[in-house]
């Protein structure tokens, strides 16, 4: 991608910052949806999905905050600005961290699953705040460059690599969460006969799932 005529090469941070910000929000919505299904239909797999998404979501939120600070210094002249989107993204990080810490503190699996599901569902209220904070309050963040109904504001030499990065991030996240889910299932079922058979026979878990 070419240099930006105003920001120079510093705008390239966007190719990591924006995909990580989008993905950490998507993962939290995924957790909230899984929590709702788990509470209504009592599906154990939903708690597995939530536990698998937490570490990646927390890491990506941290990446979004750090890269945002790195981008903000040359663009805004400051490492940190207490505007709506920055603060709501920080709240998202604390939600991830809080759920992670709660899961470590609670030993009973049923109580852990229910508490996690409730907090995940309530926390989804923060996602629209992140999304629409640039419209609701004064903020240094610019409105969305990409919309479904309008042509991208940036040239194709810039938005095509950006699109590749977003798709790549989502593919990585999908693979990571599914892999963590498989490992979590094996851990929870470690005393089951079928898991012992896999361990003793040397078969790969992909033949089971």
Predicted regions located by residue number:
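Polytopic transmembrane helical bundles with strong interfacial aromatic enrichment
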Residues: 1-209
């Amino acid at each position: 991608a070419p240099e930006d005529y105003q920001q120079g090469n510093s705008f390239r941070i966007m190719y990591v910052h924006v995909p990580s910000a989008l993905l950490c929000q998507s993962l939290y919505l995924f957790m909230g949806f899984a929590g709702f299904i788990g509470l209504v239909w009592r599906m154990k797999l939903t708690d597995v999905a939530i536990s698998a998404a937490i570490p990646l979501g927390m890491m990506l939120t941290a990446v979004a905050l750090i890269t945002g600070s790195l981008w903000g210094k040359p663009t805004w002249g400051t490492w940190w600005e207490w505007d709506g989107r920055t603060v709501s993204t920080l709240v998202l990080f604390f939600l991830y961290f809080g759920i992670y810490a709660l899961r470590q503190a609670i030993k009973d699996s049923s109580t852990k699953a229910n508490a996690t599901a409730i907090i995940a569902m309530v926390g989804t209220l923060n996602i629209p705040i992140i999304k629409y904070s640039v419209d609701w309050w004064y903020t240094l963040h610019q409105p969305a460059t990409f919309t479904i109904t309008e042509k991208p504001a940036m040239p194709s030499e810039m938005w095509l690599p950006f699109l590749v990065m977003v798709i790549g991030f989502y593919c990585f996240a999908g693979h990571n969460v599914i892999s963590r889910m498989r490992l979590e299932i094996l851990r929870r079922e470690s005393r089951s006969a079928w898991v012992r058979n896999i361990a003793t026979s040397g078969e790969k878990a992909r033949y089971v799932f």
